[in-house]
């Protein structure tokens, strides 16, 4: 394993779509995403591996040592948030590429093929910054989302996933590999590892997540000529909903629930017109599904009262509901053993953020690893992780992948999902006015 070669590749990729303050902007299926994909494809070809692109744009570099055997897949994603960080996702893909190359050399030198083959993946649209929902490519691969429905999803400009992928030349037709297991390494995007001085986080579970699609419908009118008493301002109502989403966390123990509104659009978006429509997306997350259920119920009640107060209509729909997923105990034990052999400190940790590994954990034994994030900052240009921590994580991923291709987690059962009782299967809700 060459740390210098890995770091050279990582810092090169960070120049693609680079932003002024050391971040990147490589939203899914944009020109800069295409440039990064081209780099990945060329790297895979130079390594002598098979390149496949499936029907949702996922890219695979396959190393087949044992014909007919399934594949352990390792990787992450190369797309980013708008004005995002250069470490999120890209680190996991590039680390996987170099881990796979090291194992490939070991296999060639030993002349002994392992039980399983190995593949490196760049998942499509993990971030969800351009197309919703996030974690799209891996969820389609895992059968959690319908491919045709996802290809029809459009961005804010009305461009569909199908059109965008076709436009950059990455609407593939190949099938992904048969899966034996999955591993992913990622920056923590939190402060626990840095604060405790721990090298590696062993992810044991994901938080429960759900989003609310909220449409506020008021009445368009003149900002100067319309009397204040006669206004039905959708933006004023939406601003109060944003505060409700923020403040609902105060109803629960500190940090038991996180919530925010991260996207907002309004119509007609003119400086001299009272807004007739505002669309926003609220994000609720907790380690306890029932807390999300309670927060959702409280918000719906408050939104209903607000709609009546302002004499407007508010439509609220549930979407992107993700249950708690627990990672296999055997994978956690395996990872702790690898860390110990490498002389690395480790601890179990939850992931509050969504990752491709959470989707993959529904179809195959999966391992999720974290390395420290400086100040816990992520999804912004200030995101940072040291070179030393990245190289340490590369060694860890290589060790785990080596064990997985040898069959370490073969025969492990898939974990079950933990849904909130009141939200599971919910189709949506309506609030206020004539709704």
Protein language model regions, located:
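A short beta-alpha structural unit
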Residues: 28-29, 260-269, 281-283, 287-288, ...
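Catalytic-core environment of secreted peptidases
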Residues: 47, 55, 59-91, 222
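Midchain, well-structured core segments that form catalytic/ion-binding scaffolds
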Residues: 125-126, 132-134, 138-290
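His/Asp/Glu-rich mid-to-C-terminal helical/loop segments that flank catalytic regions of hydrolases
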Residues: 206, 222, 226-251, 296-301, ...
